Amino acid sequence: MTGRKTAGKKAAGGLPEPAPAARQRFRRTLLRWYDRNGRDLPWRRTDDPYHILVSEIMLQQTQVDRVLPKYHEWLGKFPSFHALADAGEEAAVRTWYPLGYNIRPRRLHAIAREAVASYGGRLPDDEATLRSFKGIGPYTAGALMSFAFRRRAPILDTNVARVLFRVIVGRGDLKSHRMKRHLWKVSALMVPHRRAFDFNQAIMDFGALVCTARRPKCEGCPMSGMCRAYPFDPASGDAPR
């Protein structure tokens, strides 16, 4: 199978890592696809860290089409960290409705209060300090570094993990801690020095639109020639093999 050529070596744990040529091929293929098919979303038209944080917290466990109207409503009511911190936690929870998972607006409000109290209503632009905020984990910190501060930073949400697992690794337990650690390493290797912002947006879109969880569009997929899970078997899914 041609897809077996994607990985160039194995990491210390025995999991495949992409060789430099495979990384370049993956990047070119993904960015070419994104230039034609990428989604036009409002949080991609801003580098305001607050706006991007709001979108990232909302998108946790909630589909894009449900987030879009609430994102605009939220920013209309709470346009800044200062406005959110001043509004109070219960106002944030009420405005969040009906997105659910109400721990999210409470965390967002707590982040706003800390940003106002300690950083003048801004977010710091280094990953370690971002991760010191309660409610900002590795993915959200990476997303802020990439999308708000335009740094070359890896991300690993559900969509990104699925794409990298299928194309680069191909077998194993996607949900294991060992695999997640490995995929973070792969994500860091994959992010290019140029167009890092576009690359991270592209891989999320690719996972959402093509390399989906249950019924990926393998037929005609631009990654099929390098994908180690191609053709994907819906019966086995991403279970250990």
What are these regions (language model features)?
Residues 1-17, 238-239:
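Polybasic, lysine-enriched low-complexity intrinsically disordered terminal tails
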Residues 15-22, 28-29, 33-235:
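Catalytic cores of DNA base-excision repair glycosylases
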